[in-house]
């Protein structure tokens, strides 16, 4: 009788553990729901790539527009196009990046270096362009300290559409974007835990 009871208890424990287990599909669905909720809560207007192209690769800030880029799944808002020039084909350079990172799934501010206390320690990203392909690695900064040298794919998405010059006057400003980055375009933590992240990032060339 006791043996039968032990078997029943063991089977119940297995059933509970199976019910608690999340498949990759479950996690992706949870991610999609979290992104949809974030978009709704933030009153974001999502536009297609076609509309984005027709608008001259701009997003209307008065309507809080984000374009969903089909290839990457990244949602992007261009706050400022920036000054100077974008990266030219065959070019490699260092970009100074200041950012704010939010874990969308848990609605938690994870990391930032966009305040005066961290003004002297931005992230430095070494980036190269070959045709339409960008590759990059962090060489120093907070992202480098937390996640290592690998740059999230989502961070490179805006480089096709912005200028990365360094402001030379009060009238000029560095480029600034807002991104919703799914786990597939995120850093190692995002990929491992199937978590989407929200970023506010500025880019400019490093002073020579």
Q: How should each PLM-predicted stretch be described?
A:
Residues 1-18:
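Sec-dependent bacterial lipoprotein signal peptides
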Residues 18-208:
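Cross-family detector of peptidyl-prolyl cis-trans isomerase
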């Amino acid at each position: 009788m006791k043996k039968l009871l032990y078997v029943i208890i063991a089977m119940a424990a297995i059933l509970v553990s199976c019910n608690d287990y999340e498949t990759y599909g479950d996690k992706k669905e949870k991610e999609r729901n979290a992104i949809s909720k974030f978009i709704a809560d933030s009153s974001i207007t999502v536009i297609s790539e076609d509309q984005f192209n027709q608008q001259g690769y701009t997003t209307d800030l008065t309507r809080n527009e984000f374009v969903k880029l089909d290839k990457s799944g990244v949602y992007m808002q261009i706050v400022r196009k920036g000054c100077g020039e974008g990266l030219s084909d065959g070019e490699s350079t260092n970009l100074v990046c200041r950012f704010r990172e939010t874990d969308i799934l848990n609605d938690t501010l994870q990391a930032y270096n966009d305040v005066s206390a961290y003004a002297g320690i931005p992230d430095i990203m070494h980036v190269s362009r070959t045709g339409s392909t960008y590759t990059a690695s962090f060489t120093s900064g907070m992202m480098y300290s937390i996640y290592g040298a690998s740059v999230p794919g989502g961070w490179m998405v805006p480089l096709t559409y912005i200028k990365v010059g360094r402001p030379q006057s009060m009238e000029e400003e560095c480029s600034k974007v807002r991104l919703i980055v799914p786990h597939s375009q995120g850093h190692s933590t995002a990929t491992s835990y199937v978590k989407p992240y929200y970023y506010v990032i500025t880019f400019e060339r490093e002073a020579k």
